[in-house]
Design a protein with these regions (language model features):
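Transmembrane helix-loop junction
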Residues: 38-39, 45, 91, 95, ...
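Membrane-interface alpha-helices at helix entry/exit sites of multi-pass transporters
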Residues: 41-50, 73-78, 169-180
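Hydrophobic alpha-helical transmembrane segments in multi-pass integral membrane proteins
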Residues: 144-154, 190-198, 243-253
Length: 253
């Protein structure tokens, strides 16, 4: 598939802004995936290419957070392992069954999450008491959310951040940092499945990857400088946008 120069420019810009938003609150795919579809990339190829370029963004954001000390490597290692396993199983199951039923379930779960955050205005502003041991948390949520990301995907970052803040008691910035590491883990697994299937546009993916790297670095750097309330507002915005996108897909179909 051949694209014109202006189309590459549009995709680069979409990847930059997608990476910027995603590194703060997740949901970057709400920008990058529609851009790929808008320039005529077939849906299955667009999904694979979006995973490819998005992996560079999540890696850049995760690395930036790790370098600045926002990630506890010893704590999150268990989560990485179980997320990897969950993502692998989810990506494999996706090849066997249809994920359409999740189009009905996920908006309901995200709506519940949205209202909980709205009525918990101080959530994530400071570390809180954990409601579950770290070992159990990372084992259970690593498998569940890793599987979900490999199988379906939308809202994974929001679910991770909410769980890390609401259940494990992390403050918002650290939760966002840990989310990026865990997101990258499940992204890279499902990406591997798509690569094996040969469904990615490499040149398009490479151009968008550059935009993702730049946007993700800018966004993750902003998270470390800005007020927690800003991160929370961005998270609320992304959750609401994801709900609307999924509901629109249901109505349109």
């Amino acid at each position: 598939m051949e694209l014109e120069l202006w189309q590459f420019a549009v995709l680069f810009a979409a990847a930059f802004f997608g990476g910027f938003i995603d590194s703060i609150a997740g949901g970057g795919g709400l920008i990058s995936l529609p851009a790929l579809l808008a320039v005529g990339v077939p849906p299955h190829v667009a999904i694979a290419t979006n995973r490819f370029q998005g992996s560079f963004g999540s890696f850049t954001a995760a690395l930036n957070f790790i370098r600045k000390g926002y990630v506890d490597a010893a704590e999150i290692l268990r989560g990485v392992i179980f997320t990897f396993v969950g993502g692998l199983v989810g990506a494999y199951v996706l090849l066997l069954i249809d994920a359409k039923f999740l189009n009905y379930l996920i908006p309901i779960l995200l709506l519940a999450l949205l209202f909980y955050m709205i009525f918990s205005p101080n959530l994530g502003e400071a570390p809180a008491k954990s409601k579950m041991s770290k070992k159990s948390f990372y084992a259970i949520f690593g498998l569940v959310l890793g599987f979900y990301d490999g199988f379906f995907g939308p809202g994974t970052g929001s679910f991770w951040t909410f769980a890390l803040v609401g259940i494990l008691g992390l403050y918002m910035k650290k939760a966002v940092a840990h989310t990026k590491v865990l997101n990258f883990t499940s992204n890279i697994v499902s990406l591997g499945v798509f690569i094996i299937g040969g469904q990615s546009l490499w040149l398009v993916g490479a151009v968008m990857a550059v935009g993702q790297i730049a946007g993700s670095f800018a966004g993750s750097s902003l998270v470390m400088r800005c007020d927690v309330k800003f991160v929370r507002k961005m998270l609320l915005f992304v959750v609401a946008a994801t709900i609307l996108k999924l509901l629109y897909g249901l109505i349109a179909s």
